[in-house]
Amino acid sequence: MTAFQLQAPFQPTGDQPAAIDQLVDSLQNQHRFQTLLGATGTGKTFTIAAVIEKIGRPTLVLAHNKTLAAQLCNELRQFFPNNAVEYFISYYDYYQPEAYIPVSDTYIEKSSSINDEIDMLRHSATRSLFERRDVIVVASISCIYGLGMPAEYLKAAISLTVGQEFDQRQLLRALVSVQYNRNDLELTRGRFRLKGDILEIVPAYEDRVIKIDFFGDEIESIRYLDPLTGEVLQKLERISIYPARHFVTPEERLEVACRDIKTELDNRLLELEKAGKLLEAQRLDQRTRYDLEMLQEVGYCNGVENYSRHLAGRLAGEPPECLVDYFPEDWLLVVDESHVSVPQIRGMYNGDQSRKKVLIDHGFRLPSAADNRPLKSEEFWQKVNQCIFVSATPGDWELEQSENRIVEQIIRPTGVLDPEIFVRPTEGQVDDLLGEIKERVQLNERVLITTLTKRMAEDLTEYLQERGIKVRYLHSEIQSIQRIEIIQDLREGVFDVLIGVNLLREGLDLPEVSLVAILDADKEGFLRATRSLIQTIGRAARHIRGQAILYGDNLTDSMINAIEETKRRRAIQQEYNQKHGIIPQPIVKRSSNSILAFLDISRRLNSQQLEQVCENIEELSLEQIPELIQQLEAQMKEAAKNLEFESAAKYRDRIKQLRDKLLNHVR
């Protein structure tokens, strides 16, 4: 029995029990790599959840984009409501890295916008890893970037116990040293205030207030308070307050780092002057000396991450410490959609280094700036204790690492079979497709169409719109939240046909889609390779009448392989259904509002997102309403403070609506 408590309204069925047992057995026999080869819709996430429960180790679940990470986090939180399921993605809403373009002599300064809410979730993840073992962190690939040293972060934490003697002024200095700011007027995340013998802190990793009552220098009580109502939520005997930033540099380490930076600067200036690069030398000297002054005076400077090697005391070329270093030695890695995620891990380092080299060569940065980087692929895998690759189409590298430890999961709990596949010629393909679409629309079903080019997708969208089809086009410029909303609208029948290029493959859960059409299926290449075709065909694998039409004049090797693999899986599924008397059932998966789903991860929404939630009040669960009322009250007070009385009145009315809904339920 482990600390993980899996809660699900169903038991493992089909080949899930065998898959769970095989994976657990492989992990317990200390095999480093294993693969779960699971067809679309077979419940791979549930299988992984069951494995985590049985193994009982802290787990990192790696997803290849933020949208998929959010989806996985929501699912795992439903499976493990009593355990810590954390969300760790890049905290930038906007990020323009520092760069230099020699051809036009253009220097682009780094500019970024940090999402405070996501920063809180990142801190919550690292705090959970220090305090408990029943932790699952769902992360994007950005987790392989440097994150500061876990040992220093833990060492800098301030431990407080009821009855402990702690000089108040010393405690305030300690809070400032770990990047907390004093603000006696407004108490928000990363701030504290002192009123008489009462110290209130909002830690970096949550939005509750920690209230510490002193009697002289003795800690009399420690309590968690609701930030809005002041209600006591929990009484504590002890607490650890972790730093407000992950990058923590002790004062003595900072002095050594500044000396090392100065030494490197002197050596680099000699190199540049010998090479006749006087402009570059002058530029580097001026910039670095200014940064050194800032570091010595305030312990911080813009672009401080470029000095991370010196600040951390690493040797040249040594890998930075990142999220995986916060895990204990026996941690488990799960790589979701591994055929996409693994190549992403490989590509992160090379892209970063090419940009840094230009900055270093032209005197914008010291050579040590190159060590502020993501992990190389081999460095990342060296840190991995044990790993499960999860994919319907695992890559060759994953299969090679797993050797014969490949666990197939082909049977769907619903009995739904893999789609039927039809190959049709390209001549008259659009008119043929139009007929298929009309047939599906009559049955209130949805259609996905994938094209090879953006231009073709646009033209096809226009053509279908002119013929009265409700169609949308999904392209790469659409942001993550908008993308989820478009998919949401497709599921709810706002439109019937979705067209895209490379956006219709992994991670789309669309039970309403009964037809996938692949245009130019015979054009060999990345988008029409075997794995891509299987993934795209799989988008119709959740519907009992799922079909895929491949339009092409030739049968390529990729098409043949994809068709044969789908037929093989379909035959296994049919045989299982006949043997057990299973009649395929449609997947009844309630479409959940994307903003409400985001609310499950991020308990704080901006004003625009709050408005979208309020427009869907009927969809809110009773558990979500109190949280939403608190957020609306905070927005109402903020609006009133800014003299925006119309907005404040609107929030007041929304709060009344929500309270009425709660009261009606009680009655």
UniProtKB/Swiss-Prot annotation:
Residues 429-595 form the Helicase C-terminal domain. PROSITE patterns: HELICASE_ATP_BIND_1, HELICASE_CTER, UVR. This is UvrABC system protein B. PANTHER family: UVRABC SYSTEM PROTEIN B (PTHR24029:SF0). GO terms for molecular function: ATP binding; ATP hydrolysis activity; DNA binding; excinuclease ABC activity; helicase activity. It comes from the Bacteria. The UvrABC repair system catalyzes the recognition and processing of DNA lesions. A damage recognition complex composed of 2 UvrA and 2 UvrB subunits scans DNA for abnormalities. Upon binding of the UvrA(2)B(2) complex to a putative damaged site, the DNA wraps around one UvrB monomer. DNA wrap is dependent on ATP binding by UvrB and probably causes local melting of the DNA helix, facilitating insertion of UvrB beta-hairpin between the DNA strands. Then UvrB probes one DNA strand for the presence of a lesion. It is found in: Cytoplasm. Keywords: ATP-binding, Cytoplasm, DNA damage, DNA excision, DNA repair, Excision nuclease, Helicase, Hydrolase, Nucleotide-binding, SOS response. The beta-hairpin motif is involved in DNA binding. Its main location: cytoplasm. It comes from Microcystis aeruginosa (strain NIES-843 / IAM M-2473). InterPro entries: Helicase/UvrB_N, Helicase_ATP-bd, Helicase_C-like, P-loop_NTPase, UVR_dom, UVR_dom_sf, UvrB, UvrB_inter. The gene is uvrB. A motif (Beta-hairpin) lies at residues 91-114. It holds the Pfam family Helicase_C. The keyword DNA repair applies. CDD domains: DEXHc_UvrB, SF2_C_UvrB. Residues 25-180 form the Helicase ATP-binding domain.
